[in-house]
UniProtKB/Swiss-Prot annotation:
GO terms for molecular function: ATP binding; ATP hydrolysis activity; ATP-dependent protein folding chaperone; unfolded protein binding. It comes from Methylobacterium sp. (strain 4-46). This is Chaperone protein HtpG. HAMAP family: HSP90. Keywords: ATP-binding, Chaperone, Cytoplasm, Nucleotide-binding, Stress response. Molecular chaperone. Has ATPase activity.
Amino acid sequence: MSETLERHAFGAEVGRLLDLVVHALYSEREIFLRELVANAADAVDRRRFGALTDPALSLPADAKVRIRPDKAARTLAISDPGIGMSKEDLAQNLGTIARSGTRAFSQSLADAKPDERPSLIGQFGVGFYSAFMVADRVEVTSRKAGSDEAWTWASEGQGEYTLSPATRAEPGTDVVLHIKADADEYLEPLRLETIVRKWADHITVPITLLRDGEEVSGNEGTALWRKPKSEVSEEAYTAFYRHVTHNFDAPWATLHWRAEGALDFTALLFIPGMKPFLAVEEERESRVRLHVRRMFITDEAGLLPSWLRFVQGVVDTEDLPLNVSREMLQATPVLARIRRAVTGKVMAELKSRAKDAESYATFWQAFGPVLKEGIWEDAEHRDDIAALLRFRSTAVEGWTSFADYVSRMKPNQEAIYILVGDDAAALARSAQIEGFRARGIEVLLLSDHVDAFWPERLDKFDGKPIRSITQSADDLSAFAPEGEAAGEAADLTELLPKLKEILKDDVAEVRASQRLVESAVLLSASSGGPDLQMQRLLRRAGRGFGAGLPVLELNPRHALVRRIAERARAGEDVGEAAQTLLDLAHVQGGDPPRDPVAFARRVAAALAAQA
């Protein structure tokens, strides 16, 4: 056998990650059994689905997950008759870790609070490796359904694993844990039974446990979603939620209903109470599980649009054939009708829950950026989503909505004003809002990464145009400032054309500003051009050619501008001053100066002249 034993190193960073899993989650060691049983049940479901189109994959009549502790040998085995794994599958699935990246998992685990760490295991797809919390050696013997070959993967979690030929009478997988000296409790049948009932009671695949030489049932095995709501406790909902999401919190919202009539389906959906550590921004597809008459078919049916992908759970229907293929699913009108109905139900729930501002703020902070994607992607639901959006504002603390903003608009105000950037706190201090604040006009502050895009698809709310203040300087002429303006306005007749000539390659226009009160300069968007934040993103993406040129605005009442205007009227050279003003505008907007070295030199020279 030694001649055929293959030794392999784990994928990059796996050694460090294994150490993190073992030590950071030590106090939650029981979750290893949850993860291994869930993997086994999933393998059974996948073989059952495959058998619908390939009879050779048919499951045995007594298909179940078996848990067998052996105190004498100090081993714990979890066996399943599922789809199994080939040699290549073992190397790919167990020899490398976390498709989403070990570095991301490691960082999240290091940053998480102790009570948040267990949920990371399932979210990052590293559940199998939790076995090393209780075992100093793990052996996985597997035979893929449809193949006669079996292989054993083995590791002590020390940076390498081995692969060797094996024998297994039937397709499926055996995971054997050699239990550590300090983990004796996981050899006790009663302790194992308690864990299974806690974490896996709602898995529909039967689970049995070897106790006193006899197999006893470990789980109820009923489809929770098939039960009437009146028969399901909050504790049962929470347990099932934790099973499908790998979270340890309680759901923010639970939706459980039966649709009958033109469509016949049952749904049990959850909106999580916290944002997963594996950011939903990175996963673009909905993973709600589709079942047909209780049988799992796929979690890739797209039962919800991508902008509701944070919703998790199960939809079980009678209106599709059991042998439906994943390819056929995308073409069947039944699925489209179910998708429409489920989406409508979730939207109605969000609308209802939004009435509780404090509770809704919890949801919004976790999933608001994802919901905003629907404004860009989904014209059918655009207006409904708009009513659910929440923003920071210059007028109120906390979150506010478009509807609340409209209720506070000044009598002669026609538009809803927004400012888009990278940081809400920085936006609140931005020079862009000085003129609006001086006139008592509220501005909504948008700082999520998607905020640069979706306003292009939503041009109004409740009949009120939505305008970026970087494009709306002219609107201020209709409002008088509250209080006296500070300082005398400079005559910019000589200065403006000189600056425009000097900066002709960098700005579309140079003009006096209505919006500046305290700051000397700012950049705004050209009329008809993209918003400043969109220009910024285009430049970062190397697509500056599509960004257009900004407008440089000067505050004629600012001492610096007045001094430069005097020099221009006196016929002095203002070339250096022009470059410095433009760089100041870039820095004030949160961007670096175009040439940091030259900018620093000019500033140093100006300070030296004042010394």
